[in-house]
Regions:
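Sec-dependent N-terminal signal peptides of Gram-positive bacterial secreted proteins and lipoproteins
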Residues: 3-22
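C-terminal domain-boundary segment and adjacent tail
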Residues: 25, 34-44, 72, 86, ...
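Active-site beta->alpha N-cap acidic-glycine motif
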Residues: 27-111, 119, 123-130, 135, ...
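A cross-domain feature marking catalytic cores of carbohydrate-active enzymes
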Residues: 53, 80-82, 104-106, 144-146, ...
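CE4/NodB-like, metal-dependent polysaccharide N-deacetylase domain
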Residues: 66-77, 101, 117-151, 155-163, ...
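A short acidic, helix-capping loop that chelates divalent metal ions and anchors anionic groups
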Residues: 110-115, 173-175, 205-208
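Charged helix-capping and loop-helix junction motifs
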Residues: 120-124, 180-185, 212-218
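His/Asp/Glu-enriched short active-site or ligand-binding loop at hydrolase and phosphoryl-transfer sites
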Residues: 154-191, 230-241
Length: 255
């Protein structure tokens, strides 16, 4: 049911893409949100948030993150790199088994403002195929590396059956820079609001790193959410429960 909801969104967005003029990158968020092509956060009153992790799976940190999420009965969305999934398939199997969402973050973690549609399609397809071989399903969500987005990237994603997910602007603690765990947790909790999409990274440092500030911060973040009645759900779950997920002209609540 929830997957069908995402498909419906993509169909509506695809229709809008043919009816609404292409916007330049400089128009960015306002233009893309108006058409429903990109999601930064969700307009919802429920005290739910979507916590997301990019760049994994990591052989040490991702299992530690999964342990913490399980402790608090929280669900997350993992935007995985295909080349890492290929190396650590057992971790992805665990993520799926424990009810987390797997989303596409390209195969080789490519960041290129001049990327062609053909190259991006190949990156998405290769990652989709690996995920499907391991989990049995093809992801419907995609996050561009570094949040890099323009018309070509977004429209290519839509043409490949992907809804583009970014993150709430005030919910990026830049944990990849390895700040103190207390700074990461404070950054997230001080401004949290219902419908926020939170950006974190489960791949920090190298494959052989043994300590992650993100993992250290996560326990504190989860404790705060629990004490303040916030529930962590997947991105798709939050979209499904939102009344403001489709473009306004198609929204039955639109006035």
């Amino acid at each position: 049911m929830k997957k069908n909801w995402i498909v419906l969104i993509l169909l509506i967005v695809s229709f809008c893409s043919t009816q609404i003029p292409i916007y330049a990158f400089t128009n960015s968020r306002k233009a893309y949100e108006k058409t429903g092509k990109v999601i930064w956060e969700v307009n919802i009153k429920e005290k739910i948030v979507a916590i997301t992790f990019d760049d994994g799976p990591h052989p040490v940190f991702t299992p530690q993150i999964l342990d913490i999420l399980a402790k608090y009965n929280a669900k997350a969305t993992f935007f995985v790199a295909g080349n890492k999934v290929k190396r650590f398939p057992a971790i992805l199997k665990r993520q799926v088994k424990e009810g987390h969402e797997i989303a596409n973050h390209t195969y080789s973690h490519i960041y290129d403002k001049n990327i062609t549609s053909a190259k991006l399609t190949a990156e998405l397809d290769q990652t989709d195929e690996i995920i499907k071989q391991i989990s049995g399903y093809k992801p419907t969500l995609y996050r561009p590396v570094g949040g890099l987005h323009n018309d070509l990237i977004i429209n290519t994603a839509i043409q490949n059956g992907k809804l583009v997910i970014l993150w709430s602007w005030h919910q990026d603690p830049q944990d990849w820079r390895n700040p103190a765990a207390s700074k990461i947790s404070k950054y997230i909790t001080k401004g949290v609001k219902p419908g926020n999409i939170i950006l974190l990274h489960d791949w920090n440092g190298s494959e052989f790193s043994q300590s992650s500030q993100t993992v250290k911060a996560l326990e504190s973040i989860m404790r705060y959410f629990k004490n303040n009645d916030y529930k962590c759900v997947t991105v798709s779950e939050m979209l499904y429960r939102s009344i403001k997920v489709i473009p306004a002209p198609f929204d039955p609540f639109y006035q």
